[in-house]
């Protein structure tokens, strides 16, 4: 799982370098939020895990009651997570078209939403496996906490107006659960791979955008 917001920002910076119009205004804020997203997701998941566990244990529901709570909670938090995803991540790709004057906000949002649904139906399987099992195995309660932490974290940044990564938030939340259970439960190789991807993504995206800009400029403009 890598960050679309990092890829988009890296691509924009790459094009800005080629056009000699790079502005660093606001970039420091975005980078700080990139760092804060997984940390925030991690801390929030730990807090929610402990607080909700205490509340559930206090009422001591039956197995049937606990199962109902988990199923209902996963549906509700899943819908909230999808809402937060749409509120923040759709703008990562479609925002540049709105800024260039090609699309209205509503049209860009609609196209982005449909494209996200298409991506889910095609190539999301591998990312799901990495997040759901690759870092640490999640039970129903842990999954509920991860989705809720991810949704709250991403929603906060959407309100602020900063593009952040849902993948960073959810991985941070999963790490929080892993730390709570025990450090040995974490699969370090998967974690290193994820963090390496986060570091490399903006640079690779920037290089790709520079290359594409150079080729198209040479072919159609030069």
Provide a role label for each language-model segment.
Residues 1-222:
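Alpha-helical transmembrane segments and immediately membrane-proximal extracytoplasmic
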């Amino acid at each position: 799982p890598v960050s679309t917001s990092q890829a988009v920002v890296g691509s924009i910076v790459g094009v800005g370098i080629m056009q000699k119009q790079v502005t660093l205004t606001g970039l420091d804020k975005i980078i700080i939020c990139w760092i804060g997203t997984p940390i925030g997701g991690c801390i929030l998941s730990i807090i929610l895990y402990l607080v909700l566990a205490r509340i559930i244990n206090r009422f001591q529901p039956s197995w049937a009651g606990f199962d109902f709570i988990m199923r209902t909670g996963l549906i509700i938090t899943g819908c909230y997570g999808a809402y937060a995803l749409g509120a923040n991540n759709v703008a990562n790709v479609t925002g540049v078209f709105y800024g260039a004057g090609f699309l209205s906000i509503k049209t860009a949002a609609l196209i982005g939403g449909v494209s996200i649904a298409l991506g889910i139906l095609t190539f999301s399987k591998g990312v799901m496996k990495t997040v759901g099992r690759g870092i640490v195995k999640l039970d129903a309660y842990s999954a509920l906490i991860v989705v809720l932490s991810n949704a709250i974290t991403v929603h906060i940044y959407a309100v602020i107006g900063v593009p952040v990564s849902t993948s960073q938030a959810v991985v941070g939340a999963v790490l929080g659960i892993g730390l709570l259970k025990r450090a040995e439960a974490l699969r370090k190789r998967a974690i290193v791979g994820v963090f390496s991807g986060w570091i490399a993504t903006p640079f690779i995206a920037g290089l790709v955008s520079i290359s594409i800009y150079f080729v198209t400029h040479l072919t159609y403009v030069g």
